[in-house]
A protein has these predicted regions:
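DNA major-groove recognition helix of helix-turn-helix/homeodomain DNA-binding modules
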Residues: 55-73
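N-terminal flexible/basic segments that precede or flank functional cores
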Residues: 1-13, 69-83
Length: 83
């Protein structure tokens, strides 16, 4: 029972964190999704607590929180090269 409560709390915290990072950057969900290379549905799922960012996505959100300009510049370059 406690594990389920802890999991729900972790999902809520992840949702708040993802939303806070995006809003601090001043981006809509669509703009944020495009900038970080994921679907709008992924962003919505994170922010609604339906899914929790893991792995590289979780690390990226942490970097965007601490050094947004550098992270966005690197992402812009990476996405441009990929195209």
């Amino acid at each position: 029972m406690q594990q389920a409560a802890d999991d729900a709390e972790a999902m809520l915290e992840a949702a708040k964190f993802a939303c806070r990072v995006r809003r601090r950057l001043g981006l809509s969900q669509a703009e944020f999704a495009q900038r970080i290379g994921v679907s709008v549905e992924t962003i919505r799922n994170w922010e609604q607590g339906k899914r929790c960012p893991t792995g590289a996505a979780k690390a990226l959100l942490k970097v965007l929180d601490k050094a947004p300009e550098a992270a966005l510049a690197a992402l812009t370059l990476t996405l441009a090269i990929a195209r």
